[in-house]
A protein has these predicted regions:
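S-adenosyl-L-methionine
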Residues: 1-18
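SAM cofactor-binding core of SAM-dependent methyltransferases
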Residues: 6, 18-81, 88, 92
């Protein structure tokens, strides 16, 4: 079943307070939120995504932006990869 995000634009506009900041999409899925975040941050900004689903992770590998990295892991393990103080915004 295809997930259609509700209030996508509004939620991302609220999330991004610094176009040069670092952001995390904790549930990549098919990348709807990630794609919009990447469109709204600058080339100096950075987006990381997490998804433990192998199909979602494989789909994320199609994102070729230099300011994007995906992790095949659960967001509950964020602290293995990041200090939360260094993140400007997180979306679940």
């Amino acid at each position: 079943m295809l997930h259609i995000p509700v209030l996508l634009e509004e939620s991302i506009d609220f999330l991004i307070q610094d176009k040069n900041g670092s952001y995390i999409d904790c549930t990549f899925g098919r990348g709807g939120h990630s794609k919009l975040i990447l469109n709204k941050i600058s080339s100096k900004g950075f987006l990381s995504s997490f998804d433990k689903d192998p199909d979602a992770f494989k789909f994320s590998q199609g994102f070729k932006e230099k300011n994007f990295k995906s992790f095949h892991d659960s967001f509950k393990n964020l602290d293995k990869y990041f200090k939360t103080e260094s993140i400007n915004g997180i979306i679940y």
